[in-house]
Amino acid sequence: MRATLDNPKFTNVATADEYLADEVFGINVEVNGAHRFYSYQILNWHQVVNDNFDGKNLTVTYCVFCRSFAVFETNKKFDLDGRVYNNNVLIKDRENNSSWLQIRGLSVIGNNVGEKLNQYQAESITWSDFKKLYPEGEVLSTDTGFVRDYTRHPYASYDTIKTVYFPLTNFNDVFDKKDLVHGVDLGDVQIAFSEYIMRNVPVETVDYKGHKIVGFLDEVGVIRIFKNITLGETELDSKYLPKNVPLDEVLDFTYDPKKDLMIDNQTGSKWNRKGEVIEGPLLQKKLKQLESVETFWFCYSAMFENAVIADINAIEFNKQ
């Protein structure tokens, strides 16, 4: 069984750069403006890190089979359960041995069945991007107390081959098994944004069953999903409102590749990758970012059998 890390040690960017590969991804966690990087090079071997970051008790988790990460703000301490469901690892809390699905933070076995953990916002980026964006950040150290070769993947080329190790209850073959998607759970519906699609269309606005959301793909390949708003909800002064556009029309966006910005087509305001207006009539407006999961498609389609997929035009949804 993979060994959990408790009270992990951290190092600086310069030291970590000696052993981390530029192209390898990891989890970027921000607390009060400070950043920590938990590299998959290390998480491949451990998968659960119980940490305290500037007073916040966080459990950082990674499923090596689904390539899914999740960070939870919780006082519970977790270990790997040793079992999987649809290839997603179960984690077990030490307090009462309840088992939880890693990708959903949902208790499925034990005294806490049905309870959900509080997900803490985080993102997956490459080491190359992290060290450029956050040169003062802290980095999970290889000084873990365990003897591991952190320069290699314990499952070799698993991330790039088509093989899936364990049975699936469902698979939707609209994408290849190991295509990456970002999914958001809206209660009555789950919506998946495909990295494959968004590399060509970096912004997708959707209005489905009353849910208004928009996905942005930023310059370092991170997909962020936000709750969208209507023109009326912008509270824009009437003198700036476009003519003949109904107030209940949802904002739609166009990507400007030269400036790496999103421009809403109703007001011409310019939005950055964090969902913030930096120029235009809606200056200082900010969209609310929604919790989402990043994982291989085979895992998401098995976990959320009725999930719908934002298509390339972000107008319709396909379920095949």
Question: Where are the language model's segments positioned?
Answer:
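Mid-to-C-terminal functional-domain signal that highlights helix-capping/loop sites
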Residues: 1-320
